[in-house]
């Protein structure tokens, strides 16, 4: 029951997530006979991961629960402001981790090894691995895991490097691991849906390649690489995204900002109250155009016109907002660049 997504919650409510699930199987080897069964079981877990990854990806882009906010009182004044701190968190982490391209070095100083490492760096530069690494880290920070596909060049399409690097979308890629000690990866999967709504699964094991259309094997061939070419890069053991653990605080921040703007608009658009005087709709609309209202006291009663206002304490609201924001920075390990108690912390010190 713990893996079932609760669809009964309002779309404006914070979604509870606790990292991506590791997909495992108890079979010892992936064969033609069991690949379909293993795939079906793996897809049930992957579908849950995919749903959460889609949510986190949308959240990163700014599609957040506050956009579905509703109000019972004065619904015409309903601000839906996205203060996209999730994007800020991911951008900081990616910039910090990918500031310089990865360079391979060796401990052994022999000339042969040095030349080999130099050649390896040249090949990685030719494949623009630095840009691929940045995409990997971006997915890691958003949804807690990322995938890379490494394949040899197609015949006739050879370039400077004899291989190609691809960053896969974790919404349609996954790796299945063994339940035995060591959790050895048994197969990597990349799938897509065509215009006829048929799902094509590309499945790699260390010895075979299978192409399935739905449940049917339409192609199989030996894997000459001798290894699964799909590699998973989890951000951490729990496969948690960088802002996933502060989703409630991020939604609270959006709510504070939206309510704050509601308070300002409700003061500007306050109701007008008439005490001991009557006025018709036509007269009121005319008075609004003129910018003045004239009333007269009769029969000894005092007539008055005023506004109904409820003032929002901006100081307390700002204190609450700053408290939420500072908690987000502390939990996510990001230095406070706007002053405060953590101004002296560098990115490295906070992360450590």
PLM-predicted stretches and their roles:
Residues 1-163:
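Extended, helix-rich architectural segments
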Residues 29-40, 61-77, 83, 87-88, ...:
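Short charge-dense sequence patches
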Residues 70, 74, 81, 86-89, ...:
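Intrinsic disorder/low-complexity detector
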């Amino acid at each position: 029951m713990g893996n079932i997504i609760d669809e009964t919650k309002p779309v404006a409510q914070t979604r509870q997530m606790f990292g991506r699930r590791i997909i495992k199987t108890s079979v010892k080897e992936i064969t033609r006979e069991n690949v379909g069964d293993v795939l079906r079981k793996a897809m049930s877990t992957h579908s849950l991961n995919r749903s959460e990854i889609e949510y986190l990806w949308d959240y990163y882009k700014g599609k957040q629960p506050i956009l579905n906010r509703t109000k019972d009182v004065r619904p015409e004044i309903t601000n839906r402001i996205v203060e996209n701190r999730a994007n800020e968190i991911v951008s900081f982490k990616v910039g910090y981790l990918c500031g310089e391209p990865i360079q391979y070095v060796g401990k052994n100083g022999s000339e042969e090894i040095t030349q080999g490492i130099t050649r390896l760096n040249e090949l990685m530069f030719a494949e623009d691995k630095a840009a691929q690494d940045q995409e990997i880290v971006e997915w890691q920070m958003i949804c807690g895991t990322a995938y890379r596909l490494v394949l040899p060049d197609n015949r006739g399409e050879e370039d400077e490097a004899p291989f190609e690097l691809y960053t896969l979308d974790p919404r349609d890629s996954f790796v299945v691991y063994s339940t035995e000690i060591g959790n050895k990866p048994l197969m990597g999967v990349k799938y897509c849906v065509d215009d006829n709504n048929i799902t094509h699964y590309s499945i790699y094991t260390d010895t075979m390649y299978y192409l399935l259309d739905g449940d049917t094997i339409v192609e199989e061939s030996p894997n000459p690489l001798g290894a699964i070419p799909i590699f998973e890069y989890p951000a951490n053991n729990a496969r948690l995204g960088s802002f996933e653990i502060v989703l409630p605080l991020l939604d609270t921040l959006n709510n504070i900002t939206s309510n704050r703007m509601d308070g300002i608009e409700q003061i500007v658009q306050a109701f007008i109250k008439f005490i001991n005087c009557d006025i018709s709709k036509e007269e009121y609309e005319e008075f609004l155009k003129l910018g003045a209202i004239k009333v007269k006291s009769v029969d000894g009663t005092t007539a008055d016109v005023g506004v109904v206002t409820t003032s929002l304490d901006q100081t307390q609201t700002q204190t609450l907002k700053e408290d939420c924001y500072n908690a987000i920075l502390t939990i996510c390990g990001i230095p406070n660049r706007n002053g405060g108690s953590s101004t002296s912390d560098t990115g490295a010190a906070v992360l450590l």
